[in-house]
């Protein structure tokens, strides 16, 4: 059985009472996010008015979801915990390792062959420890979770940064690293800094070409990629009624690009419909019984500024179709401005490829509305200028869309139908292009557009829009085509407009599927053997990291001083490296290969201080490690922005990097660094970043007095013999300091 019905019945039986107790304790009305948070305290007796953005709180999530690229490391860690089964319902989803090339018919069998060792490991470890397993082709983790597992008022963690997608159905769903997931899987408290609350007030109604995707693209322009850090975005207002559950999921999904802990919508009639249409009528009824507590209290809605830390006002009737990019998702541009902005910024204006799919926009409604645009091109005889690629979100969606003729609408204009998987969105794309050195533009319905992310090509300018706009721009072949005002030529040379997209929220005949691709958890797991070949280059058992030796870190060579944006894609590249996600030694060869060296402006070229030669980052790190020398990385703002991949923390730890000193950190990555026993430190004065020189030997002192709220000391020994000193700060609490001293959070847990 897919649904964990007993857990859900038990949860709803006590949910409203838990919320009532929280209100009585804090003595005020609650926002919806607060209700869910307070209802999931690991120890309810510790309930109090926690200070947002400051205090760490222990929670007890209802479930865990893992995708195949991050599940490997998470489950390798779980295997060392000595448990017979997972403590909460959990699932593994095989969606990240499938490469998009020529179409699903060839790509899926090739992926099953190429990744057989990893799939066999994940399947067997799932059977061994009572975890639901969704095989390759079953679908993208967050779409599958929304269709099968998400429920209003619940809390889940997932080893993927876009886990907040489930907030569209009213969950507090948080992306985490594997070590955090292991905490939940083993029944330990899961620690999270009490989030700030950003209220997003939606009024009016979307119209024309504007979609839910454009709502979050506009918000990204307002708040930026750092604006949601350590915050939950809670949506409220009369504008909610006009947005479907899958549309709300899209908005919550891209809250990750704001750096938000998660985003959440209240339970409403649209959520009730979605639950019933996806075969969860009992859950809908249970939610209805608790409906009063699956939303913010009336007092909150009447005076939101008294309860939220920040308010963002969005009038949906004024939202325009957006095209965000290139290279960062917060570069927000209404499509009506692109005619001026494109040439002014020297963007390549020809759209070569349009890509529809990803966990952000691959629902039935997304495909139906995008297909209505494709259908018009075919029926009106409009020549399609670019290549169109489609990735359905799940096998249920693919099967239903095929039955309803939606996929045929795409195929009629030459679209390639790829596997129900992430594909190009996370760099799993064998792009066929005639010249990799040419500046070129692609348009996607994805969530991220970092340089090199989709196709590995630094000359690709990637822009993010809705599925409908993506198809329209691909048909037009122009980045500045505004479907609301511009025309195209039909086969007879007549100017024709593309009408406003249409499409059903739910399939009129209902969802259908022959085989979802799911293997239920086994009750007979004692004899299941999890085999990892000793000579495997894909999987490697983990050895514990060494504990702190009790000494300060003296004369560390600077491994790299990064300049500008340094995301987890820069730190631990995906694409061709995904195959090594279960092998720490091998994947560490990609350490910081995408980061820009502040001293030469180049990527993956740093000075090895032992011989003065310029080498790859991992080569320098390995040289230092071979001499038992610790090293340090210095970075700018929002270091570690992007995905939840803990490899970006484990790789430097494995290669003996002890400190990451940055102007600021992205939330998930900072936690991942702490979990792996590293020191994630920030400049007290950001200008001190400029004092760091290429040949510096750097000392960190004060570690014996390392305590919450304390400062540590940095001394830079420059090549000319001069020195600079300054203080650095941190956000470690007592438990996290214990992780550092033990060598990692897992080491600390094993010693308790």
Segments predicted by a language model, with ranges:
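Non-catalytic terminal/interface segments that mediate subunit docking, oligomerization
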Residues: 76-80, 306-401, 405, 524-659
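Terminal amphipathic helices with adjacent charged low-complexity linkers/tails
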Residues: 42, 46, 51-60, 74, ...
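Acidic, glycine-rich flexible loop/linker segments
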Residues: 488-505, 670-739, 746-749
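Short glycine/threonine-rich loop-to-helix capping motif typified by GTGT followed
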Residues: 47, 147, 151, 243-249, ...
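Extended C-terminal subregions enriched in glycine
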Residues: 379-429, 435, 643, 649, ...
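Long, structured ligand/cofactor-binding scaffold of large enzymes
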Residues: 8-11, 15, 20-195, 581-633, ...
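Mobile "lid/hinge" segments at catalytic clefts and subdomain interfaces of large enzymes
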Residues: 3-4, 68, 151-285, 416, ...
